[in-house]
C-alpha cells in the first residue's frame, strides 16, 4: 500500500468519525433495590420501577387513534420500557376499552399543561406488571351502554396507582385485587352509577380491593351504594390471601353497605383495617350509620373453589363519625364479632409496612386536602371534597337514586372542560423542560441526560423533575 493510499484511508476514517452521530455512553445505573418509586410512595407497590431508565414518549394528541403516534393508545402499545409525559390537557374520549399490555411503564399525568388529563368513555384495564400511574382522572360514564369499571387491575405485580381520580363507572369505580406488591394511594373514588347500564341491575359500587402485600391508604370513597370497598373474595380470586393493609382511608355516604367481604377458599384472607375515617351521609340508612365492617361468613358460590373461610381482620384506631362507641371499640361496628373473624395483632409477615401513618382524624384532613388528581383539582373533585366536609350532597339520580347517589354522569353535568396551555419548551424531548435543565446544570440539547443520575443517587434526572412537580402533595 502506497503512502498516498494510506493517507487517503486515514482522512476517510477521520471524516466518518466526525460525521457519526454522537452517542452518549451509558451511565451505570444507580441501585434500584429498596428505592421507593418516588418520594412519598408507601406500601406494597412502593418499589415498582415502572419506566425508570426507559425512553420518554410525549402525548401530543387527545385522539384515541391507534395509528396516531402522539396518542396515548399508540404510545401504550409500543413495546419497551417507557415514561409517558403529556404536552396537552383535556378529555381523551376512548372509542373502546384501553388495555395497558406493556409493562415497565410510568404514566406521569402531572406533566399535562393546564388542567390535566381525563380518560372517559370506556374502561381502562391494566394487563401488565410493573406499572406506575400518577395524576390521571378516569371518569368512564355510561354513553357506551356497557358495564365496567373505570380502572381494573387484577393478578399483576408491582403496581403503583397514585393521586388519581375515579368516577361514573357502571360496575365498580376501581377494582384492584389478586395483585402482588400493590399500592393505591391518595386517590378519590366517587359517584359510581347506581341505576345505570349494568346487566344485573342496580349497582353503584366503590370497588373490590385486595391482593398479597397490597396497600390502600389515604383514599377517599364517596357516594357509593356499597363495596366501600369489598375485600378480595374467592369468587374473583383464589390466589392472594393477603396481607391487605387498609390504612388512613376516608369513607363517606355509603348506602346499602360500607366495607365488607374478605372471605377465602382454602384459607382465610388476612386484612388490617387501621386508622380509617368513616362518615355516614344523607344516603346512609339509620341502621347502617355505625357500620364499619360486614365480614362475609357464608358464601353460596365458594364450595366449588375450596373450603370456605371468613377473613381474619385486625381492627384498630378507626373513627366512626357520630359514634363514640364504635370509635372506642371498633368491633362494635362489625356485624360479626366472633373469634373466627378477629385478629388481636396486626398482620405483618410478608407485608411492606407503611413508613408513615396518621391517626384517623389526621388522615381525614390529609386525604381531603391532597387526594385525587390534585395538582389541579377539577370541579368534580372540588365538589366531592366539599360535600364530605359539610356532610351533604348536591345531586340526585335521574333513575330513582337519591341523596348523593347518582345514575348517570349527566345527573351532575357530565365531564368538565379541561383547559390546556402551551407546554414548556423541551428541545431534546427528554421529558425535562429546557429552563429546568439549565437551572439544574443539565444540557437541554442532550437527549440522554434524563436517564442519568446526576441530580440524585436514587432517581434518574427525569424522575427528579417529575417528582419535583408534585412533592408538596405528600
Outline where the language-model segments fall:
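Bacterial N-terminal signal peptides
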Residues: 6-16
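Extracellular calcium-associated, cysteine-rich motifs in secreted modular proteins
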Residues: 409-474
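Acidic Gly/Asp/Thr-rich repetitive segments characteristic of extracellular carbohydrate-active
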Residues: 36-84, 449
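Right-handed parallel beta-helix
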Residues: 104, 109, 129-140, 155-168, ...
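Extracellular beta-rich repeat passengers
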Residues: 230, 235, 240-409
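Extracellular beta-strand-rich solenoid/capping regions of secreted or surface-exposed proteins
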Residues: 71-80, 92-108, 117-134, 140-157, ...
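Extracellular beta-strand/beta-solenoid scaffold signature
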Residues: 119-124, 144-152, 168-176, 197-211, ...
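Bacterial Sec-dependent N-terminal signal peptides
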Residues: 3, 16-32
Amino acid at each position: 500500500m502506497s503512502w498516498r493510499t494510506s493517507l487517503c484511508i486515514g482522512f476517510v476514517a477521520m471524516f466518518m468519525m466526525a460525521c457519526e452521530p454522537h452517542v452518549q455512553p451509558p451511565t451505570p445505573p444507580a441501585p434500584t433495590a429498596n428505592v421507593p418509586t418516588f418520594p412519598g410512595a408507601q406500601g406494597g407497590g412502593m418499589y415498582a420501577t415502572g419506566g425508570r431508565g426507559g425512553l420518554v414518549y410525549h402525548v401530543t394528541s387527545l385522539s384515541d387513534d391507534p395509528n396516531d403516534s402522539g396518542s396515548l393508545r399508540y404510545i401504550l402499545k409500543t413495546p419497551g420500557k417507557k415514561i409517558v409525559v403529556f404536552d396537552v390537557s383535556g378529555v381523551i374520549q376512548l372509542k373502546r376499552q384501553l388495555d395497558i399490555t406493556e409493562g415497565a411503564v410510568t404514566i406521569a399525568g402531572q406533566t399535562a399543561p393546564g388542567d390535566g388529563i381525563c380518560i372517559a368513555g370506556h374502561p381502562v384495564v391494566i394487563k401488565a406488571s410493573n406499572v406506575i400511574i400518577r395524576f390521571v382522572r378516569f371518569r368512564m360514564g355510561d354513553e357506551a351502554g356497557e358495564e365496567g369499571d373505570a380502572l381494573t387491575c387484577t393478578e399483576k405485580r408491582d403496581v403503583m396507582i397514585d393521586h388519581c381520580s375515579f368516577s361514573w363507572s357502571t360496575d365498580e369505580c376501581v377494582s384492584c385485587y389478586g395483585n402482588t406488591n400493590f399500592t393505591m394511594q391518595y386517590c378519590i373514588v366517587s359517584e359510581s352509577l347506581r341505576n345505570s347500564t349494568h346487566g344485573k341491575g342496580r349497582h353503584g359500587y366503590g370497588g373490590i380491593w385486595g391482593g398479597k402485600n397490597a396497600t390502600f391508604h389515604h383514599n377517599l370513597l364517596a357516594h357509593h351504594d356499597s363495596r366501600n370497598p369489598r375485600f378480595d373474595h374467592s369468587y374473583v380470586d383464589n390466589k392472594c390471601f393477603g396481607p391487605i393493609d387498609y390504612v388512613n382511608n376516608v369513607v363517606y355516604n355509603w348506602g346499602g353497605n360500607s366495607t365488607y367481604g374478605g372471605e377465602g377458599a382454602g384459607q382465610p384472607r388476612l386484612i388490617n383495617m387501621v386508622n380509617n375515617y368513616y362518615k355516614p351521609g344523607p344516603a346512609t340508612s339509620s341502621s347502617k350509620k355505625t357500620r364499619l365492617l360486614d365480614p362475609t361468613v357464608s358464601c353460596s358460590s365458594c364450595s366449588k373453589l375450596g373450603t370456605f373461610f371468613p377473613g381474619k381482620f385486625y381492627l384498630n384506631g378507626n373513627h366512626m363519625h357520630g359514634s363514640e362507641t364504635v370509635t372506642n371499640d371498633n368491633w362494635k361496628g362489625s356485624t360479626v364479632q366472633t373469634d373466627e373473624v378477629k385478629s388481636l395483632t396486626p398482620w405483618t409477615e410478608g407485608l411492606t409496612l407503611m413508613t408513615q401513618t396518621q391517626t384517623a382524624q389526621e388522615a381525614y384532613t390529609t386525604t381531603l386536602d391532597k387526594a385525587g388528581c390534585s395538582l389541579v383539582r377539577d370541579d368534580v373533585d372540588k365538589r366531592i371534597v366539599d360535600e364530605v366536609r359539610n356532610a351533604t350532597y348536591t345531586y340526585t339520580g335521574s333513575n330513582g337514586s337519591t341523596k348523593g347517589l347518582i345514575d348517570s354522569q349527566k345527573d351532575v353535568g357530565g365531564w368538565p372542560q379541561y383547559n390546556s396551555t402551551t407546554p414548556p419548551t423541551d428541545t431534546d424531548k427528554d421529558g425535562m423542560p429546557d429552563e429546568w435543565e439549565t437551572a439544574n446544570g443539565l444540557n437541554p440539547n442532550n437527549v440522554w441526560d434524563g436517564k442519568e443520575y446526576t441530580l440524585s443517587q436514587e432517581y434518574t434526572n427525569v424522575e427528579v423533575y417529575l417528582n419535583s412537580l408534585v412533592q408538596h402533595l405528600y
